[in-house]
Amino acid sequence: MAKKALVHKANKKPKFAVRAYTRCNKCGRPHSVYRKFGLCRICLREMAHAGELPGVQKSSW
């Protein structure tokens, strides 16, 4: 879990737009966040396996 202070800091509007960065909406992780879902890869995988994300299915080829 991310530190609450860093999550709070990321939610504030930055002084300059380039300083903004994405964080996972579920756990607050700053790396490998999918913009479309707003989730990190770990949370995305957990929620997809649980069937909590409509339209997401495991691919096979």
From Swiss-Prot:
Zn(2+) binds at C24, C27, C40, C43. PROSITE patterns: RIBOSOMAL_S14. One of its GO terms (biological process) is translation. It holds the Pfam family Ribosomal_S14. Gene3D superfamilies: 30s Ribosomal Protein S14, Chain N (4.10.830.10). Binds 1 zinc ion per subunit. Its cofactor is Zn(2+). Keywords: Metal-binding, Ribonucleoprotein, Ribosomal protein, RNA-binding, rRNA-binding, Zinc. GO terms for cellular component: cytoplasm; small ribosomal subunit. GO terms for molecular function: rRNA binding; structural constituent of ribosome; zinc ion binding. InterPro entries: Ribosomal_uS14 (IPR001209), Ribosomal_uS14_bact (IPR023053), Ribosomal_uS14_CS (IPR018271), Ribosomal_uS14_sf (IPR043140). It comes from the Bacteria. Belongs to the universal ribosomal protein uS14 family. Zinc-binding uS14 subfamily. Part of the 30S ribosomal subunit. Contacts proteins S3 and S10. Binds 16S rRNA, required for the assembly of 30S particles and may also be responsible for determining the conformation of the 16S rRNA at the A site. This is Small ribosomal subunit protein uS14B.
